[in-house]
Regions:
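Conserved anion-binding
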Residues: 1-7, 11-73, 149-154
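Catalytic cores of alpha/beta
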Residues: 1-5, 56-67, 90, 94-97, ...
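Glycine-rich phosphate-binding active-site loops on the catalytic face of alpha/beta enzymes
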Residues: 8-23, 70-86, 107-145, 154
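Surface-exposed amphipathic alpha-helices with a cationic face
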Residues: 35-43, 93-100, 141
Length: 154
């Protein structure tokens, strides 16, 4: 497995993207087996499972979150940031309502400023994936309202 090779080469965190075809077919048992198989290949790594929320219905996000709650993953990650829309506050809150404090949430993609970052954390994210880290830090150091969020993309 690629995850095992990555771990053998020094990785201590593994990101995996779920099979959306499994979700669309309703094969949540297969999805659970897939996620746990990757985790079993390098059990000492932190495992983040990317669900690409922009490709899923709300009902599918709920079912995937329920499935991941049964898995050995550490994080549910909203997106890669490269597939349509990134994280939304609504989807982070929806995932949090299912996994509660049993899994961590990483909101990724589309977080363009301090206001977005704070809102994602308030919605339940414990980590953020953003290419705007410098801007966010600057806004926080200078006061969140000192600059408008940059909405030119991620």
């Amino acid at each position: 497995l690629e995850a095992k090779m990555a771990h053998e080469n020094g990785a201590d965190e593994i990101d995996m993207v779920i099979s959306n075809s499994m979700v669309k077919r309703g094969d949540y048992d297969g999805l659970l087996k897939d996620v746990n198989g990757v985790q079993a290949s390098c059990p000492t790594c932190v495992h983040k499972v990317i669900i690409e929320t922009c490709l899923l219905t709300k009902e599918e996000i709920v079912k995937v979150s329920e499935t991941l709650l049964k898995s050995n993953c550490d994080f549910v990650k909203t997106s890669t940031g490269f597939c349509g829309a990134g994280a939304t506050f609504e989807n982070v809150a929806l995932i949090k309502s299912i996994v509660k404090d049993n899994k961590l949430i990483k909101a990724a993609g589309g977080i363009s400023g301090a206001k977005d970052a704070i809102a994602m954390i308030e919605a339940g994210a414990s980590r953020l994936g953003t290419s705007k880290g410098g801007l966010i830090a600057d806004q926080l150091l200078n006061g969140v309202d000192a600059q408008a969020d940059d909405k030119k993309g991620y």
